[in-house]
Amino acid sequence: EDGSRASLPEEFYSSRFIVDKMIEYIDRDLTQPFFGYLAFQAVHIPVQVPPEYRDRYEGVYSGGWEQLREDRFKNAKKVSLISDEAEIVAQPTEFRSWSNLDKEEKYYYEQAMMANAGMLENMDANIGRLIAYLKETERFDNTIFIITSDNGPEFNHPTSSALFNVWRLANGYHDDPARAGEYRSITSIGPEWAFAAATPGNLFKFYASEGSLRVPLIISGNGFLQEGFNPALLFVSDVAPSILEMANIPKNIQKKGIEMTGRSFVPVLSGESESIYGANES
């Protein structure tokens, strides 16, 4: 931290700690504007979460991954995220059917998905703590929030690697489903849950498909935003120039002679333009 080796608190939990530090930084001088980059580790392997968050999802995923994907696809249509004419992509034939799993397998994967969902909700709750702090310090109304993800759901299970298992056991990690999400646990939802979690997209992380490359982008704050859902194509490299325009900072910034890439998507947010990319650009 600031060029010095940092230490973690005894009761460290990444989502809570990241927000605690951001509040600490902002609190140092409330008279100054701020830019905060919160690089949450949720949801990422090893997938750990306070048990009360995991337990909130008891029974939610007992219907299996096919049912979850079907339900989410229907809901996506209901809230107009996709068109009424859209057709669901079938689960790949090499994937397992939930009905073919035995009792122990179902228990393992249900607990894994509960931990995954709980970790995501916990991150959301900590973002809520930051929002509450900004409201208390009268900084909320002048703050723009941008929330996105780097890729679609992760499907790999690290314990499938013999080399990783050597490291896991040497460092005291376990994959006991009864303790999924607890300290020193390591959990993976597998390809079937990942496929369902990416709904309505196809596939997941590591693939050149919508389930991997198309992620949510949530932006709020500071009145110029046009409310609602927008399907415009944007890239993560467009975030930085957009922030600069929102803050009225010159965008012709160079680093070692290299200009910043990306385009400002403010015209899309304000309703001035439908897209910042042409139909043939990607």
Where are these regions (language model features)?
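Catalytic-site neighborhoods of secreted/periplasmic enzymes
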Residues: 1-10, 42-51, 272, 279
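A structural signal for well-ordered alpha-helical segments within the folded catalytic domains
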Residues: 16-20, 70, 114, 121-128, ...
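Active-site regions of oxyanion-processing enzymes, predominantly non-cytosolic
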Residues: 15-94, 119, 123, 128, ...
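Histidine-centered active-site microenvironments of extracellular/periplasmic hydrolases
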Residues: 48-49, 132-220
